[in-house]
Amino acid sequence: MPRPSSPRMARGVARLSAAALETWQETWMDIGFALPNLLDSDEMRLFAQTVESLGFESVWAADHIILPIEKTDQYPYTEDGSFTRPSTAPFLETLTMLSFLAACTERVRIGSTVVIVPYRNPVLQAKMFASVDVLSKGRVVCGVGVGWLEKEFQTLDVPYADRGPMTDEWLTIFKDLWTAEFPEHHGKFYQYDGVQFYPKPIQKPHIPIWVGGHTRRAIRRVVNYGDAWHPTRQTPEWMESKLPYLRDFAHEVGRDPDEITLSLKRTLHFTDTGLEESDRIRSTGSMIGTTQEVIDDIKRCRDIGITQLTYDFRTPDVHDCIRTMEHLAEKVVPAI
């Protein structure tokens, strides 16, 4: 199979784009892909531009500043709590990555999946997201989470026990700075007044906030602050089981639950394409199966009301990732 960077493959991708876009519009399902741990800027550009040329909807970047040498048992999405990446896994800084992705692409949305909100100063973080939104002409998604890795909090001198309330306050600050002419905030963890914040984001009323997490606290955060619920490492059936609580809480606080986009992030690997699966630990909720099983799974997601899927991969090789995306576009999209 020719590499995606070849002229032949580039022409094939271009021919597929219009059909793929039209098909996804008809099925009301947006699909995006999270960048693997890449360090080569040419490979990152190739990945992002392939997502765009295949007609998919978004490119996403994860967030870790450091990883501990010692094995952790805190990761929520494996049976024994161990993380699925080694301590040497390269994570480029998330907002920097989003700026790079904005420059590489023209149409796709670019988002964080998810930025750990308490790790960064809230005013500077709001400025960084607003800047990327301006530079990308309004394509940024602010995917947020509270974090889970205590060692990372300790290293950054951020109180682990306060990560939930800090996240809530930071999100309040984001919206204030992005929308108010004269922003002012007097909270438990942060205060400011007598300032202005420009430029505002291009997207109105503000950059969309997609809230990650799988707990009831996370679901309440979605309803209180979010435009979408973006859990990770879960199955469609699990997500469906949590929707009654989301709807009930939304009605309780006077919000229409239908305003909230439902998104799900999972690992994708086809078992019938000849691509080898890496030997790293599997996370829960992975979609690892045949082409038909993936088709059935996406239909199931659509029936539940999920309208956006974000996939990552069981391989760090950019060309294998691209082959997976091509197979999804060529074999799965038409079947939906």
Description of each model-found segment:
Residues 7, 14, 18-336:
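Active-site-adjacent structural elements that line small-molecule/cofactor binding pockets in enzymes
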